[in-house]
Amino acid sequence: MENVNLTNHFLIAMPGMVDPNFNGTLTYICDHSDQGALGVVVNRPIDLDLSTLFEQIGLSLPEGLHGEIVYFGGPVQTERGFVLHTPPLTFSSTLTVNDAVSLTTSKDVLEAVSQGAGPEKFIVSLGYAGWSAGQLEDELKQNAWLSVAADPQVIFDLAPEERLPAAMKLLGIDFASLSDEAGHA
């Protein structure tokens, strides 16, 4: 498991996940190396909408985006925005994950959205999920997560409550059939 790279994969929290930050979550891994991993939870809306967030940071929001929600991205730096979006636009702090997904943490992406010049598809999260070197690999060995190659349509085209079941379907598994008991062959 040491040589596995989970960049551009989903992590599906197993039913027995005891950490309330991740119970029932689908996390998109933006970067994974021997230094650790960085991901964003993509299926946990918080009690904040995009129009309120934009108002708080002094930006106007185009009319068609007023109902959009903000997500809990993870328990690290929860006061900071993390925007998953489609390329090709890049901003001052954009990490291009692949040709379908980028991650930006600088305010200029939100300024572009405010001006109607932002990415075609995006979700805004507060916070991120981070793992130190070897930590994610250890959690995988302990059966805390399932992993599957990510499909950007799950992130950008489905409602939050549809994302976890859709990721499970990529594995060919019905989430309801999973046990919270760990086992090893």
From Swiss-Prot:
Coiled coil: none annotated. One of its GO terms (cellular component) is cytosol. InterPro entries: AlgH-like (IPR003774). Belongs to the UPF0301 (AlgH) family. This is UPF0301 protein Tbd_2579. It comes from Thiobacillus denitrificans (strain ATCC 25259 / T1).
